[in-house]
Every structure is written in C-alpha cells, then in structure tokens.
UniProtKB/Swiss-Prot annotation:
Ni(2+) 2 binds at K219, H248, H274. It holds the Pfam family Amidohydro_1. Belongs to the metallo-dependent hydrolases superfamily. Urease alpha subunit family. Binds 2 nickel ions per subunit. It is an enzyme of class 3 (hydrolase). It comes from Bacillus sp. (strain TB-90). This is Urease subunit alpha. Ni(2+) 1 binds at H136, H138, K219, D362. One of its GO terms (molecular function) is urease activity.
Length: 569
C-alpha cells in the first residue's frame, strides 16, 4: 500500500531529495540533489516510533561481522564525486558503503546492514563532506590543531617546530632530530599530520636524511634562499624518493626571475604556495606559473576573497611574519612589492576558472588556520555574485561550482601530497574523516567532526545539563580525541623510505603510520575540476593580469557571507 506525502513533509522527515535545492549558509550558493540512493518508503530513521528498531530497520540476527559499526542516515553528500543523498556505512574506521542501509530481511536493495552492533548518526537534512586538508601549515603552536578540527579540517601538512623564528616564517621541520620530535608530538592529536623538511640545500645528502627520517616532502622557502641550485637539487632528491616539493619563490628576484625559477624546475612537478604572490614569490609575476602543466598552484586564505580590507591588513602581517623592520626602507620596499591588488583580484577569477587548484591557510604566518573552509566558500559566493552562474551550471543549483571549490581543500591537496588513497573524499575504502553540517551553518560551524569513524570534535552544551543542547554551546573534544582512541582514528604520514625503514617502530609511534606515494608523475591534469593551464601574463608596470590575452580582474567585496552574522567577535 502506497502512502503519499508532500515534498515538504518528506523533507522534514527524511531530508531533501532529488529536485530539492538547498542554500549554503547565508551565501547565494545553492546545491541541487542529483540522485537519491535511499529507497522511498524504506528509508531508515532512528528515534522513538521510528524505523531502526529490532526486527524492523535493524537486522535481528546480524553480528558485528555482518553489519556496519556506524551509519549516517539520509545524508546529503557534497563531494567532488557528486551532490547526492545516501546512507553512509562505516566499518573499522573506514567508509565501507554508500547507498541504502537497513534490514535485508524486510527491505530491498540494502547495501549495508544495520544490526545490534551499529551506532547511528541521524543526518536527515544535514550535509556531509570529507574532512578538509590544509597543506600549508606553519606548526607554530599545537593549539592550531584544535582550531582546525573545529572548523572541519582533519588533515594538516606543513612544517615547523613551534614558535621558533624559522617556523614563524617558513613551513620547514629541519633535520632528522626535529622531524623525529614532531612525529612523536603528533601522537597527541586526533588529526592526520605530515611534516615537510627543509629543502633549501645545494647538496643532496642533507635532503635525503630528512626524507629517510620521515618527512613527507621538502619545502623550499626564499627566507632560506630559493636559488636555482637549491631548487634543482631538491627536485632531484624528491624524484628519487617520490615525495612532493613545495616552494615559496624569490620575491626580490635576487637569484633570478620567475622564468629562471621555472627553468630550474625544468618541467618537474612542484606545489607552488600562494601563487598570486601576496604571500610571497617572484614580484610581480609569480602568478604566471599557474599556467604550466607541472605546477600545482595553491592560494592561502588571507587573500580569499579580495575585499576592501585585504590590502590594508597585509602589510602588518608581512612585517611580523618575515622578521622585517619598519625602520629599514629596504624591508618596507620588500613588503610593498608583494602586496598588489591587481594580482589578488585576478586570483579570485583564476580560482573560479579552475586555474588555481587548492586553498590552504598559511597558519599564523599570514594565514588563519580556522578559516580555510569559510574563505573558500566566501570566494565562491563572491564569484557567483560578480560573474554569474558558471556555464556548466544550467540547472537551479550551483553544483559544478560547488564541486570545483570543495575539491580545492579536499581531494586536490590529497592528490598533490600523495595521500588520496587514504583521505580527501567521501568514497568507499577511505578513512572515515567526515564533517556533518547544518546547511544554515555550512562552511562556518560544523555540527560533528568524525575522525576515522568516531566523533572527535562537536558542538556541545553544558555538560551538567539534563540534555545536550543548553547554553553555553561550545566546540569540545569528544572521545576520539582521548586516550588510545586517537591512535586508531588518525594517521601520521611519512615518506615511503622512512616507512620501509620502520620509522614508526624506531620511534615507538602508536598512531597509524602510512606512506605517501604516487607524486612525482603527477601533472596539473590530475587535479580534479581545477586543471586549467591558460597563458598568463602580468604587465610589469601596471601589474594587470591577462589570461589568454584577456584582462582578468574583479572588484573588492564590501560584504561577504559567513561572517558577522555567525560570530560575536
């Protein structure tokens, strides 16, 4: 016997379905559900008088071997793979199934079994994304990790040793001793971590020992001297060990111009940090590197998006982070050469075109570790308002644009750093690093942050209250962040060379340790929905940016979404 419901009744009970559109926070971005893998009339839902009860939606005979450990019911999945509705089953901390959950004794088409061993997260009306990946971290203080987790970031890659002067300016963990200590420190945190060694050296031996000590890659930074010899040597070693090289190029053009750096790179794959140049790099035209097929370009979030306040705040940030002196004219000139409104404005558009592939933070070193996700969506919203719907978005929603932008902080940094087999998307076989969002707070404040299939961070009310919701509602660490649970739900990434030498056993690491791989044969074409390689030119006098001969610019935003409406401070 069939039963009819209005679309509103259905959405209230089981969440939106195919044909429904959902607004993302207070932005002008809308998503439209492309497919619904749950079965109408056989949906599972938890609660008093609901479906997931013994002998109904819950299999009465299934043991733990036959059912999932956790199911997220009726979730709206937003991922580079699509925007669709499904149940998500998690087993042993991994995404085991995406589709229809329930009891196959009563229901057709069940992909994952709910049993007595299954926990439930009711995701009706909620958006689920992969945990964010921030691939430009200065590990200046451990408190960054809590802030990142609370924003929906579950993987951090970068370098540093704490608030040392070198770390404040450069993302390097230099030398085996420092790398080993940071690998040991990583044990404390319910987050995936990987550390970059110092790549600025014109001899191979000091670089090799860092990779064999556990570095996932090497970082070249102008403050250590990004010379042609250092670049070439670093890339030779990286090719041998299959690790990534990240680079912050020579702002002052002391050792050469952008053309000289590209010549030294010589077609080899490299991750270029803050490729627009405001965060550093060849002035004024490092941005043209984004047009080459071996360059994997990223932005950092202080320039995301370009607003009326962007230029003003950058000078002071730069003076502090790069140990400059306001009393020295040369230092002021150095700072001024970086901060160019023309290239920052072009950066917005290049992201929207899919030319810039990734967004990261540059944490506490001219970047905000808790705002990667917010600023990504603020940029997407600004571009829709200024440039209109993308040609690929011919329906009600902005699905293509949303998939392009979410790839910038999930799958693409995972691909670039050789960890896409483990994290970076909502796909079967990957670590269940998932973020659950109320659509009204999407991109701003997650409801739940899962690490390896267990809740690590969550909004939580007064612990002494009779229910979970009374004020003050704060982000608090949950059980996945405690005790030995964090060892089973998070990964420390190392080089394949270090993994094969048993670095985890040598250092007594309890956390899961996995090797990075598949990096040196990458090209920009491997970066999903953000793989464009146009010809980019910069006028050396006016700093105007042209893409395939066309001027690319935009106006600064005066108002952005996901801002003061959501925060007191």
């Amino acid at each position: 016997m069939s039963f009819s419901m209005s679309r509103k009744q259905y959405a209230d009970m089981f969440g939106p379905t195919v044909g429904d559109a959902i607004r993302l926070a207070d932005s002008e971005l809308f998503i439209e559900i492309e497919k619904d893998y749950t079965t109408y009339g056989d949906e599972v839902k938890f609660g008093g008088g609901k479906v997931i009860r013994d002998g109904m939606g819950q299999h009465p005979l299934a043991t733990s071997d036959e059912c999932v450990d956790l199911v997220l019911t009726n979730a709206i999945i937003v991922d580079y793979t699509g925007i669709y509705k499904a149940d998500i089953g998690i087993k042993d901390g991994m995404i085991a199934s995406i589709g229809k959950a329930g009891n196959p004794l009563l229901m057709d088409g069940v992909d994952m079994v709910i049993g007595a061993a299954t926990e439930v997260i009711a995701a009706e009306g909620m958006i689920v994304t992969a945990g964010g990946i921030d691939a430009h971290i200065h590990f200046i203080c451990p408190q960054q990790i809590e802030t990142a987790l609370a924003s929906g970031v579950t993987t951090m890659i970068g370098g540093g040793t704490g608030p040392a002067t070198g770390t404040n300016a450069t993302t390097c963990t230099p030398g085996p001793w420092n790398i080993h200590r940071m690998l040991q420190a990583a044990e404390e945190f319910p987050i995936n971590l990987g550390f970059l060694g110092k790549g600025n050296c014109s001899d191979e031996a000091p670089l090799k020992e860092q990779i064999e000590a556990g570095a996932v890659g090497l970082k070249l930074h102008e403050d250590w001297g990004s010379t042609a010899a250092a670049i070439d040597t670093c890339l030779k070693v990286a090719d041998r060990y299959d690790v990534q090289v990240a680079i912050h190029t020579d702002t002052l053009n002391e050792g050469g111009f952008v053309e000289d750096t590209l010549k030294a790179i010589d077609g080899r794959v490299i991750h270029t940090y803050h490729t627009e140049g405001a965060g550093g790099g060849h002035a004024p035209d490092i941005i043209k590197a984004a047009g080459f097929p071996n360059i994997l370009p990223s932005s950092t979030n202080p320039t995301r998006p370009y607003t009326i306040n962007t230029l003003e705040e950058h000078l002071d940030m730069l003076m502090v982070c790069h140990h400059l002196d306001a009393n020295i004219p040369e230092d002021i000139a150095f700072a001024d050469s970086r901060i160019r409104k023309e290239t920052i404005a072009a950066e917005d558009v290049l992201h929207d075109l899919g030319v810039f592939s990734m967004i990261s933070s540059d944490s506490q070193a001219m970047g905000r570790v808790g705002e990667v996700i917010i600023r990504t969506w603020q940029t997407a919203d600004k571009m829709k308002k200024q440039r209109g719907k993308l040609q690929e978005d011919n329906g009600v929603g902005d699905n293509f644009r949303v998939k392009r932008y979410i790839a910038k902080y999930t799958i693409n940094p995972a691909i670039a750093h050789g960890i896409a087999d483990y994290v970076g998307s909502v796909e079967v076989g990957k670590l269940a690093d998932l973020v659950v969002w109320n659509p009204a707070f999407f991109g701003v404040k997650p409801e739940l942050v899962l690490k390896g299939g267990m809740i690590a961070y969550s909004t939580m009310g007064d612990p002494n209250a009779s229910i979970p919701t009374p004020q003050p509602v704060l982000y608090r660490p949950m059980f996945a962040a405690k005790g030995d649970a964090k060892y089973q739900t998070s990964i420390t990434f190392v080089s394949k060379a270090a993994y094969e030498k048993g670095i985890h056993e040598q250092l007594g690491l309890k956390k899961k340790v996995k090797p990075v791989h598949g990096i040196r044969k990458l090209t920009k074409k491997d970066l999903i929905l953000n793989d464009k390689t146009p010809k980019i030119d910069v006028d050396p006098q006016t700093y105007e940016v042209k893409v395939d001969g066309q001027l690319v610019t935009c106006e600064p935003a005066e108002i952005v979404p996901m801002a003061q409406r959501y925060f007191l401070f």
